[in-house]
Amino acid sequence: MKLVYPVIFTEDPAGGYMAYVPDLEINTQGEDLAEAISMARDAMGLVGIDMEDDGKPFPAPSQHVDCPTGGIVSLVDVDLVAYRRANEKRTVRRNVTLPSWLNAAANEAGLNVSAILQAALKQQLNV
């Protein structure tokens, strides 16, 4: 699922840029505009995954956003599937059935069966 929301960027008097996503009530910042955009995308990913996991609906993106003088409004997107894949490092235990001779050969060769299985699944799924 992809989310696209307007983000308000304003210069911070202390330096850098502030980013505010009004539809998700997110505030973040960056040292420059590029980093502020990246941080807004990251924050949207975190909040979006939490909402998705909790079964909460996503608000519709605002069509009109009031922007303070000197501010910039820009649409920022985040792909929640890609974000989750890139940031979720949790592993799960899964039992696999193998012929005993294949298991013995893998052990004898010192192979990491879990790593090989992960690589094969990623290749099969094109991820």
Task: Report residues per predicted region.
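Short, charged, surface-exposed hinge/linker loops at domain edges
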Residues: 1-4, 41-97, 101-109, 115, ...
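Short glycine/serine/threonine-biased micro-segments
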Residues: 13-14, 28, 53
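Short, flexible micro-motifs
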Residues: 18, 33, 58
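Short N-terminal helix-initiation segments at or just after the protein's N-terminus
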Residues: 22, 38-41
